[in-house]
């Protein structure tokens, strides 16, 4: 694929809204439900797109949790840096995760998801030394990424989405 336009460097905070997750009090059982929206923790991140989580927020829990829309890219920023996913539906997440809700008029969510591995590599390299690696919301917002035009983002995003779907299909195929 040849690119027609030059790529531009942008800070993640310029691409949309950055949200740090939170944990509604686990001592209030009414905040959680078997049929609520996903509430993602790093251990729930095992696919490129997340539709399920071990715990879900009830309607009441959604009033306390930080709820974001479908296509928000979730990036772990504490301890297990490098586990990234995109929400397949409206959801919420804990404080170990930052979410980027992209301005979809300018940025392709799946393209950004593919780029998120590069963000994680940068975060691992610059995370605070010590027993626990942490990249705070401000540092996350300041991370830079390279972006082609929206049309090219969409083409790249569609290519990788198709490739990821093919890989998933082959992984599920019995031997």
What kind of region is each of these model predictions?
Residues 1-8, 149-175:
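Amphipathic alpha-helical segments with low aromatic content
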Residues 1-3, 26, 61-62, 129:
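Short, solvent-exposed loop/turn positions at domain surfaces
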Residues 1-22, 47:
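Non-catalytic DNA-recognition/assembly elements of restriction-modification systems
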Residues 13-16, 26-59:
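DNA target-recognition patches
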Residues 28, 141-142, 173:
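Histone-fold recognition with a strong bias for associated Lys/Arg-rich disordered tails
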Residues 41-43, 51-117:
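A short beta-sheet element
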Residues 77, 91-98, 129-152:
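A short glycine-rich beta-alpha junction/loop motif
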Residues 122:
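Catalytic core of tubulin tyrosine ligase-like
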